[in-house]
């Protein structure tokens, strides 16, 4: 299957998660799987997505880990969506320092589209790598993908920007974001 390079075509596979308690988050449809951050699902009551005009409840994940504070663990939830046919794929490449990734997500419960560049800064620890974004990604963007050459190379799991635009950690740039590597996600899916 040919890779989609145009972000305007890719963004249709980035979905806002809807929940009864209005917790915000995103995920991405890759093949017949919906992938997001585990902490997003953990905080949601009755999470679901809209796919092809249908409301799909997110129940019975095939992979679920909510270990967002351990770099050797995982912050991920993966759901099988049998009738989904997304052309997106997970990359087996870990981005290197200087690589420019494309991030896209939805905030305000799917009303506000956010697109930005994320430059990999070389910080890597365990299953995660960091990048500096040219727009402030906040909690509503958690679970959203980053792309390199039309492939998903990571899922946003943490940022350094509080909702009031102050840094979580003053020693790091406000634009710092942390992504779970798609290579790690592929390895997890092979064992589940």
Predicted feature locations:
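Active-site region of chymotrypsin-like
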Residues: 6-18, 23, 82-87, 110-191
């Amino acid at each position: 299957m040919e890779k989609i390079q145009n972000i305007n075509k890719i963004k249709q596979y980035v979905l806002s998660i809807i929940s009864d308690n209005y917790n915000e988050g995103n995920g991405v449809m890759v093949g017949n799987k919906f992938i997001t951050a585990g902490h997003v699902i953990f905080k949601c009551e009755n999470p679901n997505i809209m796919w092809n005009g249908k409301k799909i409840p997110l129940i019975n994940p095939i992979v679920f880990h909510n270990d967002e504070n351990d770099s050797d663990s995982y912050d991920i939830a993966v759901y099988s969506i049998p009738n989904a046919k997304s052309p997106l794929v997970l990359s087996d490449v870990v981005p290197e320092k200087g690589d420019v990734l494309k991030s896209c997500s939805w905030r305000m419960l799917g009303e506000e589209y956010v697109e930005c560049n994320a430059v990999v800064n070389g910080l890597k620890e365990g299953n995660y790598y960091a990048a500096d974004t040219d727009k402030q990604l906040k909690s509503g963007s958690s679970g959203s993908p980053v792309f390199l050459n039309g492939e998903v190379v990571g899922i946003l799991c943490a940022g350094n920007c509080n909702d009031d635009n102050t840094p979580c950690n003053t020693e790091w740039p406000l634009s710092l974001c942390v992504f779970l590597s798609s290579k790690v996600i592929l390895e997890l899916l092979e064992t589940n």
